A protein has these predicted regions:
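A short, charged/proline- and glycine-enriched loop
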Residues: 1-2, 115
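Substrate-recognition element of Asp-dependent hydrolases with the DxDx(T/V) motif
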Residues: 86-88, 96-100, 105-122
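N-terminal helical cap/lid subdomain that shapes the substrate entry/recognition surface
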Residues: 2-102
Length: 122
């Protein structure tokens, strides 16, 4: 009998990609950059993925990921790359505050609540 469930939250219960898009879109408005198109969001995701893969291979540091992804993205879109540092700081805050559940994820956790212990694991 199962008594405990350990959830790996990102990309199982929570839709990280949707949260990422929402965080970038809201910051575009907050920074007075207008609206961020779906095409631009797809480009950002590709750039972001490229930087994280470089870090995983040991080619760059985490700090280089956090700043470089937005510097490259802004340069590509004709925006001031100097915005990368404050934009990243605000992005980290917004991403942490943005919760996007996958369909039925919240209902599943709630349904299991009275039957098993549940923990988030990373």
């Amino acid at each position: 009998m199962i008594t405990t469930i350990l959830w790996d939250v990102d990309r199982t219960l929570l839709d990280f990609d949707a949260a990422e898009r929402a965080a970038v879109q809201s910051l575009y408005i907050e920074f007075g950059l207008g609206e961020c198109s779906e095409e631009a969001l797809a480009r950002y995701s590709a750039i972001n993925r490229k930087y994280w893969e470089k870090m995983e291979r040991g080619e760059i540091t985490k700090q280089a990921v956090l700043e470089g992804r937005f510097q490259e993205f802004f340069s590509l879109h004709g925006l001031d790359p100097a915005l990368a540092v404050p934009f990243n700081a605000a992005y980290q805050r917004n991403l942490g505050d943005t919760v996007c559940f996958y369909p039925y994820a919240l209902e599943t956790v709630q349904a299991l609540r009275s039957h098993v212990l549940q923990f988030a694991a990373t």
